[in-house]
Amino acid sequence: MSIEQTLDELKQQLNYHAYRYYVEDSPELPDAEYDRMMQQLLSIESEHPELVTVDSPSQRVGGEALDGFTQIQHEIPMLSLDNAFSDEELEAFEKRMNDRLISKPVSLFCCEPKLDGLAVSLLYVDGKLVQAGTRGDGTTGENITENVRTIRCIPLTLQGEGWPTRLEVRGEVFMPKAGFEALNERALKRGEKPFANPRNAAAGSLRQLDSKITATRPLSFYAYSVGVIEGGELETSHYQRFVQLKSWGLPMCEETKQCHSLTEVKAYYKDILERRDALKYEIDGVVIKVDDIALQEQLGFVARAPRWAIAYKFPAQEELTVLNDVEFQVGRTGAITPVAKLEPVFVGGVTVSNATLHNADEIARLGVHIGDTVIIRRAGDVIPQIVSVVEARRPTDSKAIVYPIHCPVCGSNLERVEGEAVTRCGAGLVCQAQRKEALKHFVSRKALDVDGLGDKVVEQLVDKEMVETPADLFKLSAGLLTVLERMGPKSAQNVVDALNKAKATTLPRFLYSLGIREVGEATAANLAAHFYTLEAIQVATFEQLIEVSDVGDIVAKHVLNFFAEPHNKTVIEDLQEMGIHWPEIKALDESVPQPLAGKVVVLTGTLHKLKRNEAKAALQELGAKVTGSVSKKTDILFAGEAAGSKLAKAEELGVEVMNEEQLIELLN
């Protein structure tokens, strides 16, 4: 075989396996074998530079830095879309189309998520990528060919056969959530400013003059339409064109769907909106298009948008508002959290008047002042936060935020441990705020789960000095509780009954209820499974603690410090005297097969045939250590429906993923 033939064979193999990995998400080769083939290609091209072609996989690493971008002209304008913000506006869109159509009304739609990225045009000539450009103003864009070549999921050469001689593919370059988080983590470690959101990160990465930088960024791409078509024909259905493009190696959003009526379109919108936070990428709505290409051509365009497509936008997740004040709150472990008091603003479907500012470092990074106009962001159930300041609107009477040096509740000195971002009040349960939060945690659902003892009741109990420690809760009588607001005799008796019921608990729940720093539900369960008894945990050494799954140096130190504190020992003794108890944990019978012995597993997503706690218990019986987060230590992720960010991280780390059916098969 000649050098040229060897090179062609390597290119074909590398392109095929890149498609399997980046587009199909179904690799056939180990990473090491792919890397070996790539090194062989690079070695041949290094010895024979005259054989290097623009479609070679080696060109994905980036080339020489540019002085600036040249411009390209779009042969067919890249238009934007009109927006709809309600079902009524969507219905009006359908009516406008049907009023214009001479023949049949629209009966089939193609729907897809509206990705929050950067629109690009890819031009393939004879199956090879020869040009890539940004949308720009719709008629003129920037030539970003070298940067686009570095995006692994975009084919440099089309697969299969039947593609037109000249084919322009349009789509969105975006940065998946997991990649965005990893990129920002690396930036923070290097002391660099992180990106505000994935869209900014994608746009900034794509417009780098040095394509080697773009090559290091976790960019992806989904095709959504075509432009120029010469020397061939495509399907007459918009959806089938997607399928056609995918067969040629171009990525297609897996959420794209055909809908047979506007009722189905509305259901699709609602479904995507509900699953928005679980998707691997940021979206801000759904795009609805007439599926029939002939009808698209009949409907045509207005000045800036097609008549046959519309973007049904989600409620805004970012809005402008004014920072009126900052309130410093004290948490269960004494952490001081600055809370922004905002001019109320409707964002992400709710009215927001408070947002977290995290800590002193975040305030300094934002450079925010009281009185500033700020951009507030709310995503799903995430606490709203300020993402940036509009400094051009800063008023002359704005005030710098002064971080306190004393606890705003008890007046104790605040301290910041070296290496931590959080400032803390070290007064412990002497501080009323910490006492309230510790008691709320103690009775919470994942801890002792005391029904009827909500936050407001706990706050009243502390304010009236009826309770100081968790053990005091079990001394309360129905008669005493009736002095509280909205607490009649029946409600009071229900609380007492719930407290008595809560005395029978489990060791993991009890450990979690104590509020040891960094010891969540999963870590508490791992400690209990490892040591079997509370007494063994209390006397465990640092070396013994770090042998426990999910327990590192920091958590081990927190556990040691907690049990070394005399006050905490007294609280535990008092609770046991009040009748708190749990069943004995027996050591595992080594004669029983344990196929998951020593395996670290994570459960995520919605399970339909199993209850989460049942699945967790069954996995533990098989020897697995069930944790709450995905890391390099994770062996298996069991992913139910709408698995979200944990699934994305597992895929990024190469963790084995099993679905619910595989989980059931394993348990059986």
From Swiss-Prot:
Q: Which HAMAP family match?
A: DNA_ligase_A (MF_01588)
One GO MF term: DNA ligase (NAD+) activity
Q: Does the keyword Electron transport apply?
A: no
From what organism does this protein derive?
Answer: Aliivibrio fischeri (strain ATCC 700601 / ES114)
| Cofactor dependency | Mg(2+); Mn(2+)
The residues listed in the UniProt record as binding Zn(2+), with positions renumbered to this chain, are: C407, C410, C425, C431
Q: Which family does it belong to?
A: Belongs to the NAD-dependent DNA ligase family. LigA subfamily.
Q: Which SMART domains match?
A: BRCT, HhH1, LIGANc
BRCT domain residues are 591-668
What's any one GO cellular component for it? cytosol
Q: Does the keyword Coiled coil apply?
A: no
Q: Spell out the protein name for this chain.
A: DNA ligase
Q: Which gene encodes it?
A: ligA
Instruction: Please provide the record's keywords in A-Z order.
Output: DNA damage, DNA repair, DNA replication, Ligase, Magnesium, Manganese, Metal-binding, NAD, Zinc
Q: Which SUPFAM superfamilies does the entry mention?
A: BRCT domain, DNA ligase/mRNA capping enzyme, catalytic domain, Nucleic acid-binding proteins, RuvA domain 2-like
Q: According to its UniProt record, what is one Pfam family this protein matches?
A: HHH_2
For binding NAD(+), which residues are annotated in this chain's numbering?
A: D31, A32, E33, Y34, D35, S80, L81, E112, R135, E172, K289, K313
So what EC number does this one have?
Answer: 6.5.1.2
